[in-house]
């Protein structure tokens, strides 16, 4: 019933039987340079060092497979192959030293058994990178079942990193802050943060994200004023599309 996802033209009478044909066709042309340009040239010098052509697996026609849409030797398996090729090209462009990248992934789990409020788990991971081994990582977790809300932000320069993690439980009111250092001593944290800000200022004329520390006030504490701003801007940071941030 279903075929391998392969190059077909809209006038092909079997075209409508392949629900992913248009998507696969566009992806194949992008990866093989069929459009004659790259969406990443605007942030490079116009060259595409290290990019790879689409694999033969993407361009070859396949055979009829009744299990194709179940992800067995066709269908989604071919989509995974195309995505792997795209990720590989992204890695090669980043290694070229003249490219900024942004990636984001989100997982959401929803459960409603009918006896109480629905249970929702959401986890989002983001990464921004710039030449020179500069990266900013961000991970947020929300779990309605346990009441946990957690956010961690990491600043990386090659193999060194300073990671700040904050969590709170909106049911119990408990809050926790933790800082991790990779190939750094705690005494070097301030100098590392200054270096990270200097490096990122070359790519964006805007105050980079700063770690806001809780200031002790007796048994409790208060947080610094002002929302964080990311040094390496991603698509969701545009004025027309502001994502929700956890500002604790």
Swiss-Prot record:
Outcome recorded upon mutating residue 80 to C: In a colorectal cancer sample; somatic mutation
Q: Which GO terms describe its cellular component?
A: cytoplasm; glutamatergic synapse; membrane; nucleus
UniProt keyword Cytoplasm present: yes
Asked if the keyword Phosphoprotein belongs to this entry, the reply reads: yes
Give the record's GO biological process terms: regulation of DNA-templated transcription
Its principal location? cytoplasm
Q: Where in the cell is it found?
A: Cytoplasm; Nucleus
Region: Disordered, residue numbers: 130-149, 165-186, 208-248
This protein's UniProt keywords:
Cytoplasm, Nucleus, Phosphoprotein
Record's compositionally biased regions (Basic and acidic residues): 135-145, 171-180
Superkingdom of origin: Eukaryota
Protein name in the entry: Myeloid leukemia factor 2
Provide the gene name from the record: MLF2
């Amino acid at each position: 019933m279903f075929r391998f996802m392969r190059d077909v033209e809209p006038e092909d009478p079997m075209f409508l039987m392949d629900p992913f044909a248009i998507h696969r066709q566009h992806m194949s042309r992008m990866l093989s340079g069929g459009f004659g340009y790259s969406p990443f040239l605007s942030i490079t010098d116009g060259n595409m060092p290290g990019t790879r052509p689409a694999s033969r697996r993407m361009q070859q026609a396949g055979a009829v497979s009744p299990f194709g849409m179940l992800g067995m030797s066709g269908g989604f398996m071919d989509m995974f192959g195309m995505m792997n090729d795209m990720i590989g090209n992204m890695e090669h462009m980043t290694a070229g030293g003249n490219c900024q990248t942004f990636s984001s992934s989100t997982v959401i789990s929803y459960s409603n058994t009918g006896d109480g409020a629905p249970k929702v788990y959401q986890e989002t991971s983001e990464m921004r990178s710039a030449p020179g081994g500069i990266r900013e990582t961000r991970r947020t977790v929300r779990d309605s079942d346990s009441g946990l809300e957690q956010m961690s932000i990491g600043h990386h320069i090659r193999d060194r990193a300073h990671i700040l993690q904050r969590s709170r439980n909106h049911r119990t009111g408990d809050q926790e802050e933790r800082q991790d250092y990779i190939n750094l001593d705690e005494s070097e944290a301030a100098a590392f943060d200054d270096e990270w800000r200097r490096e990122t200022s070359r790519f964006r004329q805007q105050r980079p994200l700063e770690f806001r520390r809780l200031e002790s006030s007796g048994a409790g504490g208060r947080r610094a004023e002002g929302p964080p701003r990311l040094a390496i801007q991603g698509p969701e940071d545009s004025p027309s599309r502001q994502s929700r941030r956890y500002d604790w």
